[in-house]
Design a protein with these regions (language model features):
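A short acidic, Gly/Pro-enriched loop at the edge of an enzyme's catalytic core
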Residues: 96-105
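Short, glycine-/aromatic-enriched active-site segment of Class I SAM-dependent methyltransferases
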Residues: 137-155
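Conserved class I S-adenosyl-L-methionine
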Residues: 39-48
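Conserved Class I S-adenosyl-L-methionine
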Residues: 179-243
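A short SAM/SAH-binding and catalytic strip from SAM-dependent methyltransferases
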Residues: 104-117
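Conserved alpha-helix/loop element of class I SAM-dependent methyltransferases that forms part
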Residues: 20-38
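A short glycine-rich, Lys/Arg-flanked "PGG" loop and its adjoining helix->strand segment in the class I
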Residues: 118-132
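Class I SAM-dependent methyltransferase SAM/SAH-binding core
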Residues: 49-96
């Protein structure tokens, strides 16, 4: 991706509530399922513009919460969004090179940049004793229609749930619980993105055209099979396997 392509992509994806599927209910389910304490040390790895950070801050007002995001303008959006929360700090940096220790690491749709096994192995070094991780990752269900396969064509590493579980276990983690994100969680991402694309279309120059077309293509592929385009939300803890 050239610098111009990257700038166009960031323009298209700017000023929307989130950069991937998810709902506040998903965050609450993970916090409850992993029994994350009121004063826990929490990290949102790949926090984007801060949608889930906001939910974490509201759910655990006494916790120490950090977000890390590699893309500066998304980190800036998160800082602006969380400016009223005194217990939240947003850092611009690499989620693969953490320096703190955390009781709970949350990562919505971002661990695939590192690889599931690789990311969990790295993050294990930053987990406090008794700590846990929640992350969402694409899965391709057996018998998925062609539309779902087309949606994930640019992610050849995708696997089914059994394959995802194997990647978790290869990092020395046990699965505590898991569930698929709802269609509403996907709509929470794609509906604002579709509205953003429509607004930009009105006065778009040629430089934005490829990024707009790609966003429209992605949304169209999702709409073709919304029940089969799937993220699995995984709750995991270090086990007795390799670390």
């Amino acid at each position: 991706m050239t610098l111009a392509d990257e700038e166009a992509f960031l323009t298209v994806h700017a000023d929307i509530p989130r950069q991937g599927p998810g709902m506040p209910e998903d965050v609450h389910w993970a916090l409850d399922g992993l029994e994350v304490g009121r004063e826990a040390r929490i990290l949102d790895a790949g926090c984007g513009p801060g949608a889930d950070l906001e939910t974490l801050a509201e759910a655990r007002p006494m916790a120490r919460i950090e977000g890390i995001e590699q893309i500066p303008h998304l980190a800036d959006e998160a800082r602006e969004r969380l400016r009223h929360f005194t217990n939240v700090q947003v850092m611009t940096g690499d989620m693969g090179a953490l320096s703190g220790f955390y009781d709970f690491i949350w990562s919505a749709g971002a661990i695939y940049f590192l690889g599931v096994t690789e990311g969990l192995t790295l993050w294990r070094q930053s987990l406090a004793l008794g700590g846990a991780i929640a992350f969402s990752e694409p899965v391709l269900e057996p018998g998925a229609p062609q539309a779902a396969k087309d949606f994930w064509a640019d992610y050849p590493q995708i696997t089914d749930y059994a394959g995802l579980q194997a990647r978790v276990e290869a990092a020395g983690f046990d699965v505590v619980d898991h569930r698929a994100l709802s269609t509403a969680a996907w709509a929470a991402y794609y509906m604002p993105l579709a509205a953003r694309v429509a607004r930009l279309r009105a006065g778009a120059d040629a430089a934005l055209e490829p990024a707009l077309a790609e966003a429209e293509r992605e949304i169209s592929l999702w709409r073709a099979a919304p029940e089969h385009v799937r993220y699995e939300l995984m709750l995991v803890r270090p086990g007795t396997g390799p670390s």
